[in-house]
Regions:
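Classical nucleotidyltransferase
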Residues: 1-51, 131-135
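Phosphate/ribose-recognition catalytic cores of enzymes acting on nucleotide-derived substrates
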Residues: 2, 40-157
C-alpha cells in the first residue's frame, strides 16, 4: 500500500505523469532511472558557467512532465548529484526532440558518448521559456542553490 491505495504499475505511471518523483521512487523501491548516451549539445551551459550533459531518452520511455528535477547521474560507475531539465529547452532551442540535460555539481570530466544512468528525485519547477538568457541564468542559479541544499540532506551518492 502507498497511502490508502494499492501499489500498481498504473498508480506508479499516474504519479510519474504528475511529476511526483518521491511517490514514484517510494512505490518502486528505487529511484526512477533513465538510461542513454551523452550527446554533444550547443555547449551554451558551459558558456554560461554550468555545463550540462545531454541525453535523448528512448522514444518509448515514459517520462515525467517537462521541468526541472533534482537528479543524480552515474558516469563510469560513479554517481554525481545535479539538477536537470526534462524537455525541449524552449529559451535557447527550437529542437523538438525530448532531451534530459543535467548540470552535475562535482563532475568535470568528459562524458561525451558515454552511457549514463539518470535518477530523478524531486520536481523543482515546470520548464519555461525565459525572456532572455540572462533571466534564465538567474533562475538556474537559484535552482542550483536549492538543489545543493536538498542534497545536503537527501540522496547523497
Amino acid at each position: 500500500m502507498y497511502g490508502d491505495r494499492e501499489i500498481s504499475s498504473s498508480y506508479v505511471r499516474e504519479e510519474l505523469r504528475k511529476g511526483n518523483m518521491e511517490a514514484v521512487n517510494d512505490m518502486l523501491g528505487y529511484a526512477y532511472t533513465v538510461r542513454g548516451k551523452v550527446e554533444y549539445g550547443q555547449q551554451l551551459g558551459r558558456k554560461l558557467g554550468f555545463p550540462t550533459l545531454n541525453v535523448h531518452p528512448a522514444k518509448d520511455k515514459l517520462l515525467p512532465p517537462n521541468g526541472v528535477y533534482l537528479d543524480s547521474v552515474k558516469i563510469d560507475g560513479i554517481w554525481y548529484n545535479g539538477i536537470g531539465n526534462v524537455g525541449f529547452k524552449p529559451t535557447v532551442s527550437s529542437d523538438k526532440r525530448m532531451l534530459i540535460e543535467s548540470n552535475l555539481f562535482d563532475y568535470s570530466g568528459n562524458a561525451y558518448e558515454k552511457d549514463v544512468e539518470i535518477q530523478l528525485y524531486h520536481f523543482k519547477r515546470p520548464e519555461q521559456k525565459f525572456e532572455s538568457v540572462e533571466t534564465m541564468k538567474a533562475q538556474i542559479d537559484q535552482d542550483i542553490a536549492y538543489a545543493k541544499e536538498f542534497f545536503r540532506y537527501h540522496h547523497k551518492k
